[in-house]
Curated annotation (Swiss-Prot):
Chain positions covered by the region annotation Disordered: 152-179
Principal place of residence: secreted
Superkingdom classification of source: Eukaryota
Up-regulation conditions: Expression is up-regulated by obesity.
GO term, biological process aspect, one: negative regulation of growth hormone receptor signaling pathway
Protein name, UniProt field: Growth/differentiation factor 15
Disulfide bond positions: C203-C210, C211-C274, C240-C305, C244-C307
Propeptide: 30-192
Alphabetic keyword roster: Cleavage on pair of basic residues, Cytokine, Disulfide bond, Glycoprotein, Hormone, Secreted, Signal
Gene Ontology, cellular component aspect: extracellular region; extracellular space
Regions that span the bilayer: none
Gene: GDF15
Gene3D superfamilies (alphabetical): Cystine-knot cytokines
């Protein structure tokens, strides 16, 4: 009987079956969602554990190679694929019944070109600018953009309760400054104009002083990840640093207004800040409650910078 044959499989054979079933197809772009789901329970036998880790390591290297290949193709086809623009909104937030979060987003602050749900590449919500966690609200926001009446003055999102009591207290606090980061796919023609403008950037303050991409070599210990990340042991962290002088890599009209007001009222209006405009994905082999897993983070390493 087929069922009886399946029962005779040992741990190593079952692991091989899982690897065959979950291995991504060769060629084409790799699915980050599929990579995030890859997780395997750890066998008790030490030899099986070593073998399983070697297989996972091979998968990690294959996934990393394909991600780099995808990135190289994007870099060589900038007229076809442009980095998402990032817009920071400040929605109104309140706690509803059952502890659910209710977000109100005024249509007046939505970027030009919305409501086009397809332009939303990703939407990340934070209870405050310094919050360590963000919540992915891409799907509910896209749904609201598709279904809400065009004449409605605002969009309303209902989210699950905050995971911790401290987050619930932050919502009620007057110091809460929630942020919604919209990563937008630019229109093709506009994207080409922005790419040409970026190529002509010249820092008026001198070389290396304006908003730019900077790389820092860090170990897992430096990052505080040594207790939950297995590989890679060292990371080339790309981040955005530098000043934002007038008309230099301004992300939007708000950045222009902010700079003008900063010149008039430097004590009350801060200058625009240098922040990531897009990101490169990064793959980690990390520990889980059931063993180890592959996890792809697509908002960890800065790829490009602008002033907001």
């Amino acid at each position: 009987m087929p069922g009886q044959e399946l029962k005779t499989l040992n741990g190593s054979q079952m692991l091989l079956v899982l690897l065959v079933l979950l291995w991504p197809p060769h060629g084409g772009a790799v699915s980050l969602a599929e990579a995030s789901r890859a997780s395997f329970p750890g066998p008790s036998d030490l030899h099986s554990e070593d073998s399983r880790f070697r297989e996972l390591r091979k998968r990690y290297e294959d996934l990393l190679t394909r991600l780099r290949a995808n990135q190289s193709w994007e870099d060589s086809n900038t007229d076809l694929i442009q980095a998402p623009e990032v817009r920071i909104l400040t929605p109104e937030v309140r706690l509803g019944s059952g502890g659910h979060l209710h977000l109100r987003i005024s249509r007046a602050v939505l970027p030009e070109g919305l409501p086009e749900a397809c332009r939303i590449h990703r939407a990340l919500f934070r209870l405050s600018p310094t919050a360590s966690r963000s919540r992915d609200v891409t799907r509910p926001l896209r749904r609201q953009l598709r279904l809400a009446r065009p004449q409605a003055p605002a969009l309303h999102l209902r989210l699950s309760p905050p995971p911790s009591q401290s987050d619930q207290l932050l919502v009620k606090s007057s110091s809460s400054r929630p942020q919604l980061a919209l990563h937008l796919r630019p229109r093709a023609s506009r994207g080409r104009r922005r790419a040409r403008a970026r190529n002509g950037d010249r820092c008026p303050l001198g070389p290396g002083r304006c908003c730019r991409l900077h790389t820092v070599h860090a170990s897992l210990e430096d990052l505080g990840w040594a207790d939950w990340v297995l590989s890679p042991r060292e990371v080339q962290v790309t981040m955005c640093i530098g000043a934002c002088p007038s008309q230099f890599r301004e992300a939007n009209m708000h950045a222009q207004i902010k700079m003008n007001l900063h010149r008039l009222k430097p004590d009350t209006v801060p200058a625009p800040c240098c922040v990531p405009a897009s990101y490169n994905p990064m793959v980690l082999i990390q520990k889980t409650d059931t063993g180890v897993s592959l996890q792809t983070y697509d908002d960890l390493l800065a790829k490009d910078c602008h002033c907001v």
